[in-house]
């Protein structure tokens, strides 16, 4: 079946640097740029169309043609410059070093060299790109050093470096490029390219040197094995070379060197060839050559270091590439806004809501609500983070896994027990494919599963939930019993170096990892709805789209989804496990052919794609005779399946009577990456400043009336109940939860431009002179351009505004304002303070008045309808604060939908559930906030939860 079913939008951004360029407004582009973007039809002018780039500030420029690093370095036709000579000299030094070393030192030295350059690639370049993506660090370095400013202006302190860079770059790009006219971002990217060239060339060269140092001919290896080993290795290397060349043909130097971290091109990018064959081809199949070289070297050392390098490359993809791709090309869609506010305002506010049960439910508690739409996915089943031992499905799954584990470990591995475990695994595989397949077939044809629950007064949603539990438990038992059988059949090798023992284990582990990755990719593409075959239960199915892994394969579970069972075959070398693997594969293919495909054809018809990206490319590459052979084989296979279908159709009445009665009935991931590592340092020149010249004044959304009401609660002594006797005009500062806080600062005119203000709990720091606790990103610089990131400048309102000094002093002071909001706030209750720090260090020059963040406790009203209205009114400003008052996320009214960013970033929902817990004493999961989608729905849920829990809250 083409399970390219997705509840999300179509997303094709699955290849390495495979980035569709964000379209720009046609009115802001030149005619040439409009031609490049396709907004204007190109005219036949006899000239080659040029590519136009766009910097973040909107500057449009011509992107000159450049060449790949191998051609630049080694091709005699390409001009050479000093940086090329330096790179070639470093490469030559590597070769000479390995050649000159004694035999015993070649392997460790070459390994250290390679690991150094690999770390320079994945950690070094990764760190630079991460900071460039988030803070424009490289461009800011160029701005601060002024290395691209013409020395004729007198502003460049490095004229010789300017001339050197100018000569180097213009030598490499003789056409359509002017160093003086090119944007700062483009010149910075060109310099960054030279660093990348050095690291990548040294990385590959040191790897090859390590492989040469480790290469040997295995003892007693037959001639046939040697030929096969070298032939396979050469094929993998040639395939790797084709992947690299084809990828460069598609993405050019712009994406090859991560150009979109610096600027965008006003041109639609097309991705074909290797980008239709595999996800992230440069990082997945693009490393096949490493394993080919490992084969030719016949060295496990080379194999293991190749695996380490490949894993590091995937880490680079996950932590650097993918976040930038999502930020640049996958912004959240515009939020759904209320079309007619007047209509919304006149709607009667009853206990009903879009998610509330109909009024009839108040009188008939178990009345079913029939809906063709799937319920919102709030409490998912899959994943350790969704484990909930209060749920019977999860408890049952954990118990049966524990029982399987206990029986497996506590019983001996005798032939009789091995037979029992293999038979048990075979039975569960038969149930998982044949039994579940039968149930789904009945559900597809006559809604048998849903009808059973409706017959007993349940809802289709209840039938769906019970089905998910049944399928989940069946899947758990299928794989748990298979793993138990593998455990019983496995024997730990006595000699890991004998024959292919170690290789079999490495390949087996790799296949198991491949199946895990495939399953995760399938789940990410289909979601909970598609994973549990939701379109068998709900007629209103989402549009059939092909994204994620389904962009490349129609049925990834057909081959890749069972790679792990064949990995177990390699590891165990057992005939019984081979039988289980064959049984699993045959049954899975039959399940796809007889259950999934007919249902998909009935549901989606002609919209089902015949060939996925990989198959299309393979067919395109086949010669005509092989294409004809492929067509003949397709006819044979289709005819065979038709025969089997006819046979089963005729036998169905005889089997139905017996089969129809068969079935009737923690992780949490937290991430806390401090944006600032705090090390206590005392600045030597702090003595030249008077701390009395520094001050901080705090302003926020006032909530002090709540504090004043709480001061006299009747729990204090008689004197404490009296009004406060204030000897000044100051009053307690109590601000709303999540509301932005403005900080006004004053400092001497000669204050350091690297001064900064941090937010802390009052109890965090015992010292008033030095801050010894990390700000964890809750800090703002007082001046722009002083630090190499943009995050610390978010919130600056004004800087260095000259004002007269207070207290009548005949001098002037500098002042400014910053606003702390969003991630720069503490999302909890407590007492906090701001600290003004000197010169980028942690010497405290001023501390603000302490202020309290408090969430007002909701006061209940008697009437339910009035209570819900009050809850809505109290909840709306809190939700808006939790959503940073962002117009693309925060609702303006109680009926307005939350922005789509709430679905993508879990912090917003977590803020809301904390506030709800403090206000109403009701604890929700973050998924509830995302599922409700509006303040009104959430208020309805709160009111009903309080009504349900009221009997248990009585004191």
Swiss-Prot record:
GO BP annotations listed: methylation; phosphatidylcholine biosynthetic process
Pfam families in alphabetical order: PEMT
Keyword check for Lipid biosynthesis: yes
Residues spanning the membrane: 82-102, 109-129, 195-215, 223-243, 277-297, 300-320, 389-410, 419-441, 473-493, 496-516, 575-595
PROSITE patterns: SAM_CHO2
Top EC group: transferase
Any GO CC annotation of this UniProt entry: endoplasmic reticulum membrane
Biased composition (Polar residues): 1-10
EC number: 2.1.1.17
Domain of life of the source: Eukaryota
Pathway annotation from the record: Phospholipid metabolism; phosphatidylcholine biosynthesis
Membrane topology (Cytoplasmic): 103-108, 216-222, 298-299, 411-418, 494-495, 596-955
Ranges of Basic and acidic residues composition bias in the record: 11-20, 40-51
A Gene Ontology molecular function term of the record: phosphatidylethanolamine N-methyltransferase activity
Lumenal side: 1-81, 130-194, 244-276, 321-388, 442-472, 517-574
Residue ranges, compositional bias (Low complexity): 341-352
Catalyzed reaction equations: a 1,2-diacyl-sn-glycero-3-phosphoethanolamine + S-adenosyl-L-methionine = a 1,2-diacyl-sn-glycero-3-phospho-N-methylethanolamine + S-adenosyl-L-homocysteine + H(+)
Membrane topology of this protein: Multi-pass membrane protein
Annotated spans, Disordered: 1-61, 328-358
Keyword Cell membrane carried by entry: no
Subcellular location: Endoplasmic reticulum membrane
Record's protein name: Phosphatidylethanolamine N-methyltransferase
UniProt gene name: cho2
